[in-house]
Amino acid sequence: EKDKIYGILFDGAWLWEEYLNTILKPCGFRHPENKSQKGGLKMFQKDADNETISKNSRKLYPDFWKDDFILDAKYKHLNNGVGREDLYQVVSYMYCTTAKNGAYVYPYEKVEDPVSYQLSGYKGIIHVAPLYIPQTEMIFEDFIAGINGSEDRLRNFLQSKDN
């Protein structure tokens, strides 16, 4: 009995996406369900082309999107930069949807401003936006106030770029 270990496993990346959905949905972002193949975007203009070129009915499933914005939820720090595959994925989604903005949102333990980078070509912009998660609050109400402020900062930033 003393050597037993009890625990729970969960998909932190999935939970992070669902949490972000509560913040982003009121801003008009859609959250496709790639596992159930709902809400995907077309890669090609003609449906027949999806089958002809790939034999796999290519659909795009960004974590979040709206008219001129692609957003990727990352449950990892991006302070050392965005990984190559992550970058190519968002740029591809932006290109296929002609979105001017792409963003990565990730949890962070400090308050930091988002950083923006202009792409070559059609001049889209990639934003790297840390979402501050309060770490030191000892009272639940203080944590709630801190996280609400973080959520508001993220919403305000994204809405300021969506013009």
Task: Please provide the spans of the model-predicted regions.
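Catalytic core segments in nucleotide and nucleic-acid processing enzymes
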Residues: D3-N163
